[in-house]
Amino acid sequence: TRWNCDWSSDVCSSDLRLAETVEVAPDRQWVEFTLREEARFSDGSPVTVDDVIWSYETLGTQGHPRYLAAWSRVDRIEATGPRSVRLTFTEPDRELPLLMGLRPILKKAQWEGQDFAASSLEAPIGSGAYVVDQVEPGRSISFRRNPDYWGRDLPLMAGVNNFDVIRYDYFADANAMFEAFKAGAVTVWRELSAQKWASEYGFPLMTDGRAVQAEIPNERPSGIVGLVMNTRNPAFADWRVRQALIEMFNFRFIN
């Protein structure tokens, strides 16, 4: 399931891929997914309810920590039909139906007799439009478009998956990635530091016009970078003290 969110209104809608339908209980106590009959893994084998249940249970107990917290709020998972699976929550939950719809589904047979939690460079068999192509441990991973992707003709897939190969390069830290951008190895950079924005963009890529420094307005929620005075602290209780600190704050020097 792919979820599309309008961050300005905090409303999300879903595009169903593996699932043909999704049903949520009126009291938000459970969510039920029905698989598309034509859903296939990249090796051509069908995606089954057993694969779905195994994926949820395995990722929820042995997968990335971000899966564990959500799984702890699931009371049980069960097949309700040859292509349907229901997850019942420990208590009514408005968020879990969305989170459960984002779980990757893996092929159970690929992992039989193996330790799922063990480190491995074996590429998992998935059901998406791309398959793992090449891996350079610690440096990069590339995905190749699957010409036999089962869902390529779904209406919701029109106009997407237009690249033959997608590559992700890894950097040890943000400074290394910024240096790669300055050298032209990275084509887009999102600057989060007001200080860098104002003082560190005089490198050749910018001065000769090969790169453009621009502000792109958007309506996504964002955090702040600044100082916040805790008025519950007696030191900041007097408004005149807070005003004095504001007057003393050298914004230009710090930024």
Please name every model-derived segment.
Residues 23-27, 34, 68-111, 129-136, ...:
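Surface-exposed binding/hinge segments that line
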